[in-house]
Amino acid sequence: LVLDPTLLLTNDIWERVFPIRNMFNERYVLYYRLLRNSFNEKQVADFAQRLGCKLLILEGRPRPTIKKDTISSANPIEFISLIKYADFIFTSSYHGMVFSLIFHKQFFASFSENSDRAESLLTSLDLKDHLIPHKSDIPTHIRKIDYTSIGLKINSLRSLSEKFLKESI
C-alpha cells in the first residue's frame, strides 16, 4: 500500500505551504457533500445542534445555491481551511476524509460506490467504524478518534510509502 500523495505531507507542511485561516467566527460542523444524500441532512443538522455548532454544507460540485449556510464551491485553500477549523466533519469525498485525518478531525465518511481505497485506508488505521454505509443513519455512539495512535500509524505508512517510492525510482 502506497499512501495517497496528500498523506505524504504532514499537517505542519500543509499549514506552511498554504495560508490556512479560519473563515468563520463560530463553531461549525462541516458536511462536505460530494454525493447528494450520502447522509441524512436532518440527522447531520441535529448532530451539529447537539454539539452546539452551526452546520455548514460545502457542495462538492458547483450548484446553484439557495440554502443559507451552504457553500456552492471552495478553492483549495478554502477547502483545507474549512476542514481544519471544523469541529466535526461528514464527508462523501475521499480527500475530505484524508484531510480530516491530516488535521486530526473527528469525522464520518460515506460513499455510494468505489469506496475500496477509503475502506482500505480506514481499515489499516483501525477506523473502519467511521465509514458509514451510504444513506445509513448516523451512529448514536461515536468512538472518538485517538490521533496519538493514528498519527503513529500514518507516520509508519508514510515511511513505508516513501521507502517504496525511493526504491522504485
Question: PLM features: residue spans?
Answer:
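Active-site anion-handling motifs in enzyme catalytic cores
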Residues: L1-I169
